[in-house]
Amino acid sequence: MRVLTALLPLAAFLAGPAGAQASDRAGHYYLRGVMETGSELMLHPDGRFQWYLVYGALDLFAEGRWAERDGAVILTAERTKDVPEPGFRTLVLKVEDRSLVPPDGRGAYVRPADDRD
């Protein structure tokens, strides 16, 4: 029992940064740097996301789960009542500083507080 009690602070220390990292990444992002395209991404701290992209007459939506690993945020869309046909199945966004870069490398999802150009 004493060994278990002694290891609890270590377990809390090791578990802390992973949870903090995920909650630090959570937030409201806007796509920047792509002409005539509107897109927003909301990463919720509970691991859920909401996303949309509008380009001309094309409107795409998705919601589902997100996770961060290997320098990327992975969005996995799910069919829901509100979004029966998601705009993608899986989307991998590369983490660059505090921005999230789409696979084609054009534009980046940024949070307004981080956008200081």
Language-model features: locations:
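Lipid interaction determinants
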Residues: P9, G16-D117
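Positively charged n-region of N-terminal signal peptides that target proteins for export
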Residues: M1-L4
